[in-house]
Amino acid sequence: MRVLGIETSCDETGVAVYDTEKGLLAHQLYSQVKLHADYGGVVPELASRDHVRKTLPLIKAALKEAGISHQQLDGIAYTMGPGLVGALLVGACIGRSLAFGWNLPAVGVHHMEGHLLAPMLEENQPEFPFVALLVSGGHTQLVQVKGIGDYHLLGESVDDAAGEAFDKTAKLMGLDYPGGPRLAALAEQGNSDRFTFPRPMTDRPGLNFSFSGLKTSAANTLAANDSDEQTLADIARAFEDAVVDTLVIKCRRALKETGYKRLVVAGGVSANKHLRAKLEALLEKQKGQIFYPRTEFCTDNGAMIALAGALRLEAGEREPLAVKTHPRWPMTDLKPMVNISDAV
């Protein structure tokens, strides 16, 4: 099955073509970082309007890259949620309209399921069951995964997501948007021994997270010290260490509670080199396996939507003609899949 995937949930326009026999045929991505930079964050109205301008040209480019015409597609998948409602509507309306005009089946995909399945775009694919750490600007969750659509939430952030905490702290430090990657880059120059921040909620049972207090700790430390480059780097390092250690501690607990030996890490923060190194060390110590997508598929992209959509379309799922979006959509609301082929 050959599927066109469309991702427009936030500030990236992603389009891809995925073939269940040949793998990824095309991948086109446009980032709105420059558009939102002057505002220090995503402006929903501007994001929606830019998706309107960019989605159709990217679809044409993806089909050209794949070397196919729309007549050679077998289905269309689009992000149905969660995300910014206006941005979601752009992708959903375009995807559903093209499916109707081209007489193709369509399916709406859960954005976070796309992230969770993104490692299946790689040659080294995880087998079920596994624990998934989904860590991004909007979500920080630990999920027990028994199969596609068979998800049990083990823990999540009770306030800020990890990526959100990175971005907010970077803004406090005066770093340009997008702040998270810039803070991580600055942290590489920092001394890990100068400052120490707490590891929130690791002193009690459970798998939930809390990162808003770390932002407060960083703000207090910034206010009490000089703002020279080395001090900022040291604070960035202490902040990153605290976030990464917290994530690693919770992953260790989740693996112990489930008895699983496989960990999938996905979402924008999964590209963090410090996080990857510490999680790899954890899984090596436990004689387990860790899986994550290549860096370009850690952030939002159309490839993960095309893959997830292809699996659901092959299993017989179809969307009605009505265009629906779910700006808020718990992943645990999804139903377990049946009749999944060996497409991946």
UniProtKB/Swiss-Prot annotation:
Substrate binds at L134, V135, S136, G137, G138, D167, G180, N272. Binds 1 Fe(2+) ion per subunit. GO terms for biological process: tRNA threonylcarbamoyladenosine modification. Transmembrane segments: none annotated. It is found in: Cytoplasm. It catalyses: L-threonylcarbamoyladenylate + adenosine(37) in tRNA = N(6)-L-threonylcarbamoyladenosine(37) in tRNA + AMP + H(+). CDD domains: ASKHA_NBD_TsaD_bac (cd24133). The keyword Ion transport does not apply. One of its GO terms (molecular function) is N(6)-L-threonylcarbamoyladenine synthase activity. Its cofactor is Fe(2+). Fe cation binds at H111, H115, D300. PANTHER family: TRNA N6-ADENOSINE THREONYLCARBAMOYLTRANSFERASE, TRNA N6-ADENOSINE THREONYLCARBAMOYLTRANSFERASE, MITOCHONDRIAL. HAMAP family: TsaD. Belongs to the KAE1 / TsaD family. Required for the formation of a threonylcarbamoyl group on adenosine at position 37 (t(6)A37) in tRNAs that read codons beginning with adenine. Is involved in the transfer of the threonylcarbamoyl moiety of threonylcarbamoyl-AMP (TC-AMP) to the N6 group of A37, together with TsaE and TsaB. TsaD likely plays a direct catalytic role in this reaction. This is tRNA N6-adenosine threonylcarbamoyltransferase. The gene is tsaD.
